[in-house]
Amino acid sequence: MVEELGKVFKGKKTKKLERGVACPTCVSPGNLLMNFSPLSDESKTLKEGELVRIDLGCHINGYVAHAGTTIVVSADPAAKIDGEVADLFKAGWDTLQLAIRTLVFGKKNLDVTAMIKRSAEQFGFEPYEGPFSHKHKHHVLDETAIIMNKTIPDQRHHPFQIHKSLLFGQGLFCS
């Protein structure tokens, strides 16, 4: 990833831009939701059929980009995923797409949270408590402006309106 980042923005004015790996960059086995960071002497063998979340993050000039996906461990790359796991993947994808489409100028963060809840429930799933979508700023990964996957009565959250210059890292988790 560092090698590929070195190929980006190579002009005179931009070649000195800071760039590198960013959090989260990890592989989290199924029993851990995200950000697995084992000690150097720990190891874990992934098992056939286990759900695994892969997260990659990088930054250029202090702005983070990250991508994540969940896969099913399989020795056969052509193996089909079906049943509840396939439904969960479909629910996660469709719910994320709806959340992104709701994240528009004039809407509120709680509108996005409500859309996540409604969409996941249509598939018979529930958004996880805890993971948030954070507003990003220069050299700041998790700002105080958040979009919750699920409203939690005791959780402090600050409603705000979406405006044109906001940048969010959208994270979505369902069970």
Identify the residue ranges that each predicted region occupies.
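Active-site neighborhoods and metal-handling regions in enzymes and metal-associated proteins
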Residues: 1-175
